[in-house]
């Protein structure tokens, strides 16, 4: 399962249901991480409609709080109130459904 670490502010907003997207820079590092799960389409800029579970972890320790979210991914811009820089392109993980919490 793909695991992404996020800051507490964003983790809490996602957990409360307020934040519905998570952003990652469009860089080779994330291309390599996303392709095995979402396929080549995400690199080519197409929205991947297939839903995949992603573990969002608040910290690097395996015991850190985490949630499993069902997500789709696309390339696009994000919302500044959710941490995105205006006009910058990101891999946008759209959170479709919240799963279990650890």
Locations of regions flagged by a protein language model:
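Structured alpha/beta reader/binder surfaces that contact nucleic acids or chromatin modification marks
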Residues: 4-102
């Amino acid at each position: 399962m793909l695991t992404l670490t996020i800051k507490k502010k964003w983790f809490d907003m996602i957990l409360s249901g307020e934040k519905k997207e998570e952003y990652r820079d469009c860089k080779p590092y994330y291309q390599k991480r996303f392709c095995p799960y979402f396929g080549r389409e995400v690199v080519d800029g197409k929205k991947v409609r297939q839903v995949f579970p992603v573990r969002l972890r608040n910290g690097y320790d395996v015991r850190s709080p985490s949630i499993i979210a069902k997500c789709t991914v696309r390339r696009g811009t994000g919302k500044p109130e959710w941490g995105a820089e205006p006009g910058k392109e990101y891999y946008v993980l759209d959170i479709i459904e919240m799963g279990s919490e650890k």
